[in-house]
């Protein structure tokens, strides 16, 4: 696996800040084990990020060898001891190879990150409404989630301060005041707001925990109810478990909606135009030979040829992504041009 300092070409296929602390009989073995474990973990994170939550699809992809999809890794820091390896690394996975595996498995995925979405948790109990108070379990669970999540939907939370509390008081936020929600979205630079309510209801003989999640646009208009649940507080309800379960359900709904709206479209066009720079006829014939060996190309025809450049029309029997993957295995890169269906063939630079 090559070590590089460059930026990963596709952020969706990058995992950064991976902490390694592994032990083995030798320092070298500890390094091998640590990096292998980190690669498996990072690959799982990428798959969880780009595919719609689905246990079967996840298992299909994670059954593949993670190290075969690695483009490069970058070591931020490391300390190699006699029987221990401590490091922090970033791993970049090869987008074309992962896409190829997804296509072969017949799976759908997305790669586009969302603009910021504000999480706005509200907690209500007999003593009052809490939005900006610290050390409230409901509020803390959402803060922890916002800090740790690393999927395609990018969430944000407002950091409590005196000025914010005065401009966004708790009671109007509880009532979903449209202007207050819009002001909160503006303060966070968010395009949407997830209003997250949890409260204790003592109006019945058995108290209840009520949880509700609603999605609003940046103007404070309701878009959808994304979660709703009531639980009896009969002495058997664990608030930590209840909050985490509701949180997972709500986030799955939002993630699925984003994925469905931004599914990666496999380019299944019938033909593409490929241009390539050459220095001799030998180069030209070599390129044509390599292209003719790619499984996704059914036929090739010459469009133009000069002393320095050639152009070929390729009739495809598969997707452009499959052709790109096949060429990559031969040391070439097929780069999309400015015009639709136009590509440039280049030697990969290692």
Language-model regions, residue ranges each:
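Signal peptide-directed extracytoplasmic domains
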Residues: 51, 55-121, 131-137, 174
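N-terminal segment of the mature soluble domain
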Residues: 35-58, 115, 121-179, 287, ...
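Amphipathic beta-strand/beta-sheet edge segments enriched in Tyr/Trp
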Residues: 8, 14-17, 188-239, 322, ...
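A short, hydrophobic beta-strand-centered structural micro-motif
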Residues: 67-77, 159, 172-208, 212-214, ...
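C-terminal soluble interaction/assembly domains
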Residues: 219-236, 245-249, 270-350
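Pro/Ala/Gly-rich low-complexity, hydrophilic intrinsically disordered segments
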Residues: 86-121, 219-221, 225-269
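Short, well-ordered alpha-helical segments
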Residues: 18-62, 180, 238-249, 253, ...
């Amino acid at each position: 696996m090559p070590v590089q300092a460059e930026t990963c070409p596709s952020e969706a296929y990058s995992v950064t800040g991976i902490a390694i602390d592994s032990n083995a009989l030798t320092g070298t073995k500890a390094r091998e084990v640590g990096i292998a474990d980190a690669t498996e973990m990072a690959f799982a994170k990428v798959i969880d990020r780009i595919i719609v939550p689905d246990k079967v699809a996840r298992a299909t992809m994670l059954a593949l060898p993670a190290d075969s999809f690695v483009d490069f890794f970058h070591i931020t820091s490391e300390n190699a001891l006699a029987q221990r390896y401590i490091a922090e690394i970033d791993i970049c996975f090869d987008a074309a190879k992962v896409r190829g595996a997804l296509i072969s498995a017949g799976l759908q995925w997305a790669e586009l990150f969302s603009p910021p979405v504000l999480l706005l948790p509200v907690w209500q109990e007999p003593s009052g409404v809490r939005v900006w108070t610290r050390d409230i379990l409901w509020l803390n669970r959402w803060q922890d989630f916002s800090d740790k999540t690393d999927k395609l939907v990018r969430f944000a939370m407002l950091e409590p301060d005196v000025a914010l509390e005065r401009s966004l008081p708790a009671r109007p936020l509880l009532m979903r005041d449209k202007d207050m929600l819009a002001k909160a979205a503006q303060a966070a630079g968010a395009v949407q707001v997830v209003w997250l309510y949890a409260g204790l209801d003592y109006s019945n003989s058995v108290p209840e925990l009520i949880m509700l999640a609603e999605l609003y646009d940046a103007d404070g208009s309701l878009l959808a109810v994304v979660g709703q649940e009531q639980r009896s507080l009969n002495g058997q309800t664990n608030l930590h478990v209840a909050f985490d379960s509701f949180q997972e359900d709500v986030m799955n709904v939002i993630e699925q909606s984003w994925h469905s709206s931004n599914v990666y479209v496999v380019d299944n066009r019938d033909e593409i135009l490929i241009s390539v720079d050459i220095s001799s006829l030998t180069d030209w014939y070599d390129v044509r030979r390599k292209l003719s060996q790619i499984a996704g190309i059914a036929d090739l025809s010459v469009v133009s040829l000069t002393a320095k450049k050639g152009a070929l029309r390729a009739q495809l029997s598969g997707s452009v992504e499959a052709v790109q993957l096949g060429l990559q295995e031969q040391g070439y890169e097929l780069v999309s041009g400015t015009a639709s269906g136009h590509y440039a063939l280049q030697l990969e630079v290692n």
